[in-house]
Amino acid sequence: MTQDSAALIADMDQARAELWQIVAALDPEIDVCPGWNKRDFYAHIAGWEAIVYEVFLYNTTGTPLKDYPYNNLDDLDAANAGFVAERQSGTEDNIKLECEINRYAIKRMLNDIPVENFDKPIQFPWGKLTATKFVQDAIKHERDHAADILKLQQPLT
């Protein structure tokens, strides 16, 4: 891992910490995003990161990717609904823990990518990305969620 990749991963950690702080302050029953309470929001994150974990596992060990019923990730609404539905029986704390375990595993895999491979394309279900681009996109995704949640929580004027 290079200093640049370590800094990117640190930024990814910071974006997650900021997002978690915002979500933690919310009532469990209010909408974090339209139609999603906190548990559903964590289920969304857990679902996507489970796929990312599998992609990195496949790229390092050749372990086949799981076949999801909504594998056409061009339909993001169906994928997100699937992630939430899969976790309906889980508690908010357990689903958040799944997020944290997935993120830990992803970071370990990122740390194990040789420097010369960090900018090689990796096939994700939604397209090819380098590890660098994946981390940049993860940071943006979490910061976008944080901004959207804060905006949704603002009183109407």
Q: Predicted regions span which residues?
A:
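Short amphipathic alpha-helical segments at helix-loop
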Residues: M1-D4, C33, V84-T91, W126-T130
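Short helix-to-loop capping/linker segments positioned immediately adjacent to catalytic or ligand/cofactor-binding
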Residues: L26-V32, G90-I95
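A general structural signal marking secondary-structure boundaries and capping sites
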Residues: V23-L26, L110-N117, L156
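Short, contiguous alpha-helical
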Residues: P28-A78, K120-T157
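Acidic/histidine-rich alpha-helical segments that form the ligand environment
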Residues: D75-F118
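Extreme N-terminal tail/first-helix region
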Residues: M1-Q14, N94
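A non-catalytic, amphipathic alpha-helix used as a structural packing/dimerization or gating element
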Residues: D11-E18, L97-A105, K140, D144
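Solvent-exposed, charged/polar functional surfaces in cytosolic regulatory/catalytic domains
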Residues: E18-A25, A105-M109, D148
